[in-house]
Regions:
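Loop/turn-to-beta-strand initiation segments
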Residues: 108-110, 133-137, 441-442
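The −1 position to Zn-ligating cysteines in a subset of zinc-ribbon hairpins
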Residues: 405, 474, 489, 510
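C-terminal accessory regions
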Residues: 39, 307-452
């Protein structure tokens, strides 16, 4: 594919930078689908450059892109790997990260970093230390969502950005979009939205203006046409909140299989699933959002391991999958916390409690240090064990944060999910969701939505179903089957009176009896709390 005029101009700018005697940061900016990586690879000698990615997923996508475009001799690493990051847990179970400076004598003079919007503050500080020693070509979109930091960095328009965008020595922005058809309404919508993201405006009015029944659709959550579309096509919902994504996982799955009792966590031979987090066991590694096909399932495997001075027996699933490269792998999946991680966690906690008592009873500083190291080793070992059990999800819904770097033909956007106190923040999230679509956006509204901190809320049938489905339609206390939705009460694990919230981690399905008993206990505790505050 030939470069367009804009890309040729960028190519000339990059050549001027590469051939100059100056080092530093050259930013190649622009929205998704503008050909940033393509232009860079058409300009530099790929074999004489080092490619870095902010995450494992980016590196995986980058390797695939380079291979598919006829490049074979290239080097791709994560920024963490480049700086020799090591992650451990200390005696307080706090993550400790160490690093070392790279040997620059072995590093090419050109370093290309893709998706720089995902560079965190820690990596930024290290890159700044070698900024004047190499020529960096930094590829990214400043309107994508940056990593969450304690103190976010905002640009002059109020958007959250990675700090690296504030330190570019040279930059060029590509504006001609290639992902969507240029003459399409979808292209016009995403382009106009990007140009006006610094403003606050009504999403509903925008959708009603651009909806055309073709590549921009607009439905209510209960619309039959929405369900027909889900049944006949393969859309993916991109939401903001985890509960919304869980609800759409259930809605899409139950619609496709015509099963109101559909279980969102069920895994079956033939399923296509994606990893909902980083997985590493021995040499097998899978990254968040990586897709595999399930070939075989062994539902009950048992194993005994030694952790510290104790033995733990646990059970799990062994699943044979085929990855996107056609390679078969065996991965481990838990059979629920109680059956898999709890037997290990219990023995780790037991040993740590014993070591802590020894620390408290000792006055020997060196001995205390030895004991704290033992605790740190146990915490690190348990953390590594947890990483060795995969969380697999059906590819029906994903959060906007996790969707970055992906492209889907049909994207469902639950528009009611995108709201924030700062309009720039919700605009950034919505922009990420919309720019995932290559063919069509299906906006969905739901007048019964709620806020995380709302004190009263009647859950919709879809939400009740999705929460019950997440727990395999069982009461989370007594474990009896809940086959009729009328028998299910959705409960806040931490009551709203004690600052609990309406998010998925704090919601559980209970049978009527268990909910009644829990409510009695909560009323007593609330009275005690109120009494205590008036003394």
């Amino acid at each position: 594919m030939a470069l367009n005029n804009e890309q040729i101009e960028l190519q000339n700018k990059i050549n001027d930078f590469v051939n100059s005697d100056k080092n530093g940061f050259f930013g190649v900016l622009g929205g998704g689908g503008t050909g940033k990586t393509f232009t860079v690879c058409q300009t530099i000698n790929v074999e004489d450059a080092l490619f870095l990615g902010a995450t494992n997923k980016i590196c995986s996508v980058l390797k695939k892109y380079l291979t598919n475009n006829g490049y074979f001799k290239f080097e791709v690493k994560t920024i963490d790997s480049f700086f020799g990051f090591k992650i451990k847990k200390d005696h307080n179970n706090v993550t400790v990260i160490t690093h070392k400076k790279p040997n620059l004598s072995k590093v090419p003079k050109i370093i290309v970093i893709d998706e720089i919007s995902l560079i965190n503050d820690r990596s930024f500080d290290l890159l700044m230390e070698i900024k004047d020693k190499r020529k960096f070509i930094l590829i990214g979109d400043n309107l994508q969502i940056p990593p969450i930091e304690a103190t976010p960095t905002r640009d002059k328009n109020g958007f959250k950005v990675s700090k690296i965008f504030t330190q570019l020595d040279y930059s060029f922005e590509l504006k001609i979009q290639n992902r969507q058809k240029i003459e399409s309404k979808l292209f016009e919508l995403i382009s106009k939205f990007r140009q006006n993201m610094d403003k606050s405006f009504s999403y509903i009015q925008m959708i009603e203006k651009y909806s055309n029944g073709n590549d921009i659709l607009y439905y209510d959550i209960n619309d039959k046409e929405l369900k027909n579309l889900i049944y006949n096509k393969n859309p993916i919902a991109v939401g903001y909140k985890n509960l919304t994504c869980l609800s759409f996982n259930w809605l899409i799955g139950s619609t496709k299989f015509n099963d109101k009792g559909y279980k969102v966590n069920s895994l079956n031979v033939g399923d296509t699933v994606f990893f909902d987090g980083f997985y590493k066991r021995d040499k097998d590694v899978f990254y968040t959002s990586e897709i595999v096909n399930i070939l075989e399932i062994d539902n009950f495997c048992e194993e005994t391991i030694k952790i510290g001075n104790e033995f733990a027996t646990y059970n799990f699933k062994k699943i044979k999958v085929k990855n996107e490269n056609g390679i078969d792998k065996i991965i481990f999946v838990g059979n629920g916390y109680k059956n898999t991680l709890y037997p290990i966690s219990y023995r780790v906690t037991k040993q740590i409690d014993k070591l802590k008592k020894q620390i408290d009873n000792s006055s020997n500083v060196k001995y205390k240090w030895i004991l704290k190291n033992k605790i740190a080793e146990l915490n690190t070992e348990y953390s590594n064990i947890k990483t060795g059990f995969a969380t697999l999800k059906k590819p029906y819904a994903i959060t906007a944060h996790k969707s970055q770097g992906s492209t889907f033909e049909d994207v469902i956007i639950p528009i009611y999910d995108y709201a924030a106190k700062v309009s720039q923040d919700s605009n950034q999230l919505l922009y990420v969701a919309m720019s995932r679509a290559s063919g069509r956006i299906i906006f969905v509204n739901n007048k019964s939505n709620f806020k995380d901190n709302s004190n009263r809320y009647s859950f919709t049938q879809m939400e009740r179903n999705s929460i019950a489905s997440y727990y395999d339609y069982k009461c989370n206390v007594c474990q009896i089957d809940l086959e009729d939705l009328r028998d299910i009460d959705i409960d806040h694990i931490i009551p709203l009176a004690f600052n609990g919230t309406n998010n998925i981690a704090n919601l559980q399905p209970l049978c009527k009896n268990c909910h009644k008993e829990k409510t009695k206990s909560e009323k007593h505790n609330t009275k005690t709390k109120n009494y205590a505050t008036t003394i």
